[in-house]
Regions:
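Low-complexity, intrinsically disordered short peptide segments enriched in small/polar/basic residues
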Residues: 1, 40, 74-75
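Short, charged/polar N-terminal "headpieces" of proteins
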Residues: 1-25
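Surface-exposed loop/turn and secondary-structure junction residues enriched for glycine/proline
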Residues: 4-7, 15, 44-46, 53, ...
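A short, structured beta-strand/loop element
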Residues: 19-60
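Acidic, low-complexity intrinsically disordered segments
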Residues: 54-92
Length: 92
């Protein structure tokens, strides 16, 4: 499971097994350690985020904080996604 970066006590990462065909580029965010019930954000072609799910039940304030941090690091996310999976597509 590639860990892309850390924001305070939150890990932003993607799973090594992201299904076949490969899902569009996205990351999971979890406090403490990666978990299967993490919150998921799609990365759009324009570099913005879309909330795919909030399985971690974070507050709107926390979701906004995570979304902004993910958008600020979109280039790193996309680079690491391509390095790991060798291909990329976008949700929209």
């Amino acid at each position: 499971m590639p860990q892309v970066f850390k924001i305070g006590s939150f890990w932003v990462y993607f799973w090594a097994n992201e299904n076949k065909p490969l899902e569009p580029v996205h990351v999971h965010a979890a406090k403490g350690k990666p978990t299967a019930n993490a919150t998921k954000f799609w990365i759009t072609r324009s570099g913005k985020t879309l909330l795919a799910n909030n399985n971690s039940d974070y507050s709107a304030k926390m979701l906004n904080y995570l979304s902004k941090a993910i958008e600020a690091n979109k280039d790193i996310i996309i680079e690491k996604w391509l390095e790991f999976f060798g291909e990329i597509n976008y949700y929209c």
